């Protein structure tokens, strides 16, 4: 078995060796992107099929939303035809941490369909529900028998794949607390991503992007994986302690529980939105997800359907300790054109209360409305030219007094952890970083 990064390898049938210089990635990202992936006994055809690859991602009540959304988003960025299927009796799913999603279809309606890849997210009780879903078990076993790809993350390798007998004689990884269970049915390893034959496994929320890009590579080839990974602004050293850059330090105060508003709109970046909501809810903040427009259901940038708690019209009636915007081009443009939201943000800034944004939103929302005046900020690399002050754009997470900004999907967990740190302290941020495997 050989360890290597996505950015520095090529494959033959058994071994893995470097395939190109990482400097070529600078077209996509100013930082080298690294995936810590272990692989054994697999092959990739020298010529990838040009036909669209079909991917199934089953979800259930209690599915880990960040894992599911990243998998969907990244595989769709790669050009795969991704079907999100609910194993419940309805397409609406109440994922972990109170995050609501809407699947594309019911699994019961597509059990005869054939997929190039089936990917299982984790989360509890969602992982148990997937394990107990007989139609899904049958599909995954047939997938294995037919020599097609199966993948699972978090608790799913141990709960589902292990229980179904797919891991006998295989190396696999999973969420740390399930390692003992995994060891009873596989050779358990602590890799962030593990490939053994046609089985790919990974550990948890913080490894999901690496896991997903690895599967883009398995399914669509290394060139497509590099193309997809660059704009994600992935961590250069995944697993290392997260860091933030802070200027003009001030305390972020709150009474009782932090009240946090997360607006979303059609075209919002789903990975960023869910990362912010997921991590802040883990920290026990009171997070209000508010939809712009007339519907609680929002279709995000990669067609993930998210359901807000309230409409912005309702959310406007309350005050917040923080207003924080996800990115996504369509979502940021909607935010910028919402007089109601812009007025809320201006009032927040004038009151010296925290506000923040990631990806396109600092450049498309904050900059044109004067919300970055006298402040240092960062944004999505391709949007940084729109910032008047570009002196600190290289930072992944930047805090300037009551303002916090960040770069893109691959910085979204760090961004959310930085918010936790500002409200609750460094120890709480590190605790959640460890729990999410950032």
From Swiss-Prot:
Q: Which UniProt keywords apply?
A: Chloroplast, Plastid, Repeat, Stress response, Transit peptide
Q: Where is the PfpI endopeptidase domain?
A: 53-220, 258-424
Q: Does the keyword Repeat apply?
A: yes
Listed GO CC annotations: chloroplast; chloroplast stroma
Q: What does this protein do?
A: May be involved in oxidative stress response.
Family membership: Belongs to the peptidase C56 family.
Name under which the protein is recorded: Protein DJ-1 homolog B
User: Which lineage?
Assistant: Eukaryota, Viridiplantae, Streptophyta, Embryophyta, Tracheophyta
Protein encoded by which gene: DJ1B
């Amino acid at each position: 078995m050989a360890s290597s990064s996505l950015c520095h390898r090529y494959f033959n049938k058994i071994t893995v060796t470097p395939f190109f210089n990482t400097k070529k990635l600078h077209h996509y990202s100013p930082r080298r992107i690294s995936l810590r992936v272990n692989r054994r006994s697999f092959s990739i055809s020298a010529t990838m099929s040009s036909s669209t690859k079909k991917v199934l991602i089953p979800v259930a009540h209690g599915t880990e939303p960040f894992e599911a959304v990243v998998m969907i988003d990244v595989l769709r960025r790669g050009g795969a035809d991704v079907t999100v299927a609910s194993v419940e009796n309805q397409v609406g799913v109440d994922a972990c941490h109170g995050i609501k999603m809407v699947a594309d279809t019911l699994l019961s309606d597509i059990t005869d369909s054939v997929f190039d890849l089936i990917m299982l997210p984790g989360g509890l009780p969602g992982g148990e529900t997937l394990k107990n879903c007989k139609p899904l078990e049958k599909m995954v076993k047939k997938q294995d028998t037919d020599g097609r790809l199966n993948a699972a993350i978090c608790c799913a390798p141990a709960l589902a794949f292990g229980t179904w007998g797919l891991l006998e004689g295989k190396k696999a990884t999973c969420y740390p607390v399930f390692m003992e269970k995994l060891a009873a049915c596989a050779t358990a390893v602590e890799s962030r991503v593990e490939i053994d034959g046609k089985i790919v496994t990974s550990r948890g929320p913080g490894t999901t992007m690496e896991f997903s890009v690895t599967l883009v590579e398995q399914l669509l080839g290394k060139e497509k994986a590099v193309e997809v990974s660059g704009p994600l602004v992935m961590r250069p050293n995944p697993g290392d302690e997260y860091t933030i850059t802070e200027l003009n330090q001030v305390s972020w105060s709150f009474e009782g529980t932090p009240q946090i508003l997360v607006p979303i709109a059609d075209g919002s970046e789903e990975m960023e939105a869910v990362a912010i909501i997921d991590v802040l809810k883990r920290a026990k903040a009171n997070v209000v997800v508010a939809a712009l427009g007339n519907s609680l259901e929002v279709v995000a940038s990669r067609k993930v359907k998210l359901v807000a708690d309230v409409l912005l019209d309702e959310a406007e009636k309350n005050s917040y300790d923080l207003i924080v915007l996800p990115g996504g081009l369509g979502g940021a443009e909607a935010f910028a054109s919402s007089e109601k939201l812009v007025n809320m943000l201006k009032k927040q800034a004038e009151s010296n209360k925290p506000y923040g944004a990631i990806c396109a939103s600092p450049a498309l929302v904050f900059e044109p409305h004067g919300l970055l005046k006298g402040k240092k900020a960062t944004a999505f690399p391709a949007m940084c030219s729109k910032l008047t002050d570009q002196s600190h754009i290289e930072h992944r997470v930047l805090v300037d007094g009551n303002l916090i900004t960040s770069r893109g999907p691959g910085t979204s967990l760090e961004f959310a952890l930085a918010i936790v740190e500002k409200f609750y302290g460094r120890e709480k941020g590190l605790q959640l970083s460890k729990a999410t495997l950032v």
